Amino acid sequence: MNEKQKRFADEYIMNGCNGKKAAISAGYSKKTAESLASRLLRNVNVSEYIKERLEQIQEERLMSITEALALSASIARGEPQEAYSKKYDHLNDEVEKEVTYTITPTFEERQRSIDHILKVHGAYIDKKEITQKNIEINIGEYDDES
């Protein structure tokens, strides 16, 4: 795969999988962009590269199990957590206010984190076992004539 094809593949991902826009952004002719994009997407090397990059991007965006457990452990210990808030004015296309603040987990949040960690490690059984017992009742002698 050459550099221009790689640029096309990267642009294809950034343009939301729009082949024509990606081809033009990668430097291909506007006249042939659509047909060229179709041909490039059928190219095994280009399609494999796109698939690998999408998987890599997916992995980078997702929180790993280790990261999730580390965050749960931090909350369970009651360590202060950094939070970020941004107020955006869409009409004027500008940020009105940005605030970074610290939150200390409440007792309930800490307990939920501990429960979560114990469940993940199998040390906490969330199920209740129901056992069945048969009870035998003797009423005495039964008489039809009474």
From Swiss-Prot:
Key word DNA-binding present: yes
Highest rank taxon of the organism: Viruses
Consequence of changing residue 74 to F: Virus escapes the CBASS system in host bacteria, allowing virus propagation. Virus makes a much longer cabRNA that has altered secondary structure
Pfam families: Terminase_2 (PF03592)
Phenotype seen when the gene is deleted: Virus assembly is blocked at the procapsid stage; DNA is not packaged and tails are only rarely assembled on the propcapsid.
GO biological process annotation, one example: chromosome organization
Keywords: DNA-binding, Host-virus interaction, Inhibition of host innate immune response by virus, Viral genome packaging, Viral immunoevasion, Viral release from host cell
Molecular function (Gene Ontology), one example: DNA binding
Membrane-spanning intervals of the chain: none
Disulfide bonds: none
Similarity comment: Belongs to the SPP1-like small terminase family.
PANTHER family in UniProt: TERMINASE SMALL SUBUNIT, TERMINASE SMALL SUBUNIT-RELATED
Subunit record text: Homodecamer. Interacts with the terminase large subunit; the active complex is probably composed of a one monomer of the large subunit and two or more decamers of the small subunit.
Physiological role: The terminase small subunit specifically recognizes the non-adjacent pacL and pacR packaging subsites and regulates the ATPase activity of the terminase large subunit. The terminase lies at a unique vertex of the procapsid and is composed of two subunits, a small terminase subunit involved in viral DNA recognition (packaging sequence), and a large terminase subunit possessing endonucleolytic and ATPase activities. Both terminase subunits heterooligomerize and are docked on the portal protein to form the packaging machine.
Note: Implicated in the production of cabRNA, an RNA that activates the host CBASS antivirus system. When the gene is mutated the virus becomes resistant to the host CBASS CdnE-Cap15 system.
Protein name: Terminase small subunit
